[in-house]
């Protein structure tokens, strides 16, 4: 296996699209996402190329979490929130999503809607699969990139020529395809998966059991062991066990930097909750005082990266326990590599267009 580059979201889209454009019989493409918004041109281009690849005989498999069809899109309610059918609505936002799924299937691709709700009117953020990965033949991509806004700050690590990791994720997909409601938790029998790969990297999949996350615990342990520096990116202000662990690291004179979106980046009511979280941390004098919010960038932070000394964790997990409480399936890969850790930080700086604070 060759060295692993780390890509931004648009670079990830470009590589997948370029592969799909020429893929034919004998080629394999897998793409897993939680968010799905083909209204964005790069996402739509990728979907159209996947349709073409399937028509040419390539094995194309797309996993889309039910969140994309149950959570509101703007002011429009998702069809899987009140129905079992993707076509139960004529609303504009969801009509084209459903058309893309239908076009993929008609072309011969397999589309799996993961973690479908058991009941109508269920909480659309509970029991989700937040897992994102892709496979193009023997190359494997793992990280946090949704098939949504291409301009968000994000990260995917690429494992070139890695049939071992590819087989693990292909076998995982087969289990999900066979599970009731295509639910990750049931596919994995409620057990998180931890596999040490040939190069020493660790691939972790959280099954989505409520109040349990191997990825979260691994991240907290890495911060606890750090002696020099901690660098973390996440969507939300850190809170709970994460902010307490960061605060203890800061008190050990570990240099801590956290990049996350300010409350103003979120729509109501989430912005109020985020502002309250930030205020509570400031009142308690916790680690927020030593952290850096994303005030110098207009771009939305979606990357989930943790660097603790030479340890790098990159994946779909935000390292806070909101998703853990709701039972969210996640994926991450962990390396012990100063070079990769540095490269991940450089990727974030490049996307922000500014040196890291």
Regions found by a protein language model. Name each.
Residues 29-36, 232-234:
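Short acidic, glycine-rich surface-loop motifs adjacent to enzyme active sites
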Residues 2-27, 35-225, 259-311, 317-333:
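HKD-type phospholipase D/PLD-like phosphodiesterase module
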Residues 334-357:
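Amphipathic alpha-helical interface segments
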Residues 10, 236-237, 263, 338:
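Short, surface-exposed acidic/glycine-rich loop or hinge patches that mediate macromolecular interfaces
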Residues 207-222, 228-248:
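Beta-propeller domains
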Residues 53, 248-249:
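Hydrophobic side-chain positions on well-ordered alpha-helices
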């Amino acid at each position: 296996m060759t060295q692993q580059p780390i890509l931004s979201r648009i670079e990830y889209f470009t590589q997948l699209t370029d592969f799909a454009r020429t893929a034919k019989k004998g080629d394999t493409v897998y793409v897993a996402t939680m968010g799905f918004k083909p209204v964005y041109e790069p996402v739509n281009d990728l979907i159209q190329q996947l349709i073409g690849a399937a028509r040419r005989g390539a094995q194309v498999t797309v996993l889309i979490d039910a969140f994309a069809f149950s959570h509101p899109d703007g002011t429009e309610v998702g069809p899987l929130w009140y129905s079992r059918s993707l076509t139960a609505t004529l609303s504009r936002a969801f009509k084209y999503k459903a058309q893309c799924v239908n076009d993929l299937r008609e072309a011969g691709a397999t589309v799996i809607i993961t973690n479908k709700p058991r009941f109508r009117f269920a909480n659309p953020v509970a029991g989700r699969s937040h897992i994102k990965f892709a496979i193009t033949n023997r190359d494997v991509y793992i990280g946090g990139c949704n098939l949504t806004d291409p301009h968000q700050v994000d990260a995917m690590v690429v494992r070139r020529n890695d049939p071992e990791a590819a087989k693990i994720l292909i076998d995982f997909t087969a289990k999900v395809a066979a599970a009731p409601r295509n639910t990750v938790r049931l596919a994995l029998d409620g057990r998180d998966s931890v596999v040490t790969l040939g190069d020493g990297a660790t691939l972790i999949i959280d099954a989505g059991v409520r109040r349990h996350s191997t990825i979260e615990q691994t991240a907290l342990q890495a911060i606890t062991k750090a002696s020099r520096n901690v660098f973390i990116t996440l969507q939300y202000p850190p809170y709970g066990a994460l902010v307490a662990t960061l605060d203890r690291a800061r008190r050990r004179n570990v240099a801590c930097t956290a990049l996350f979106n300010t409350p103003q980046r979120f729509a109501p009511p989430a912005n109020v909750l985020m502002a309250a979280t930030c205020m509570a941390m400031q009142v308690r004098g916790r680690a927020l005082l030593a952290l850096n919010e994303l005030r110098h960038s207009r771009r939305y932070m979606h990357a989930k990266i943790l660097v603790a000394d030479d340890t790098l964790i990159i994946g779909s997990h935000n390292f806070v326990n909101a998703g853990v409480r709701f039972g969210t399936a996640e994926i991450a890969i962990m390396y012990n590599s100063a070079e990769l850790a540095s490269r991940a930080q450089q990727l974030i700086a490049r996307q922000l267009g500014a040196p890291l604070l």
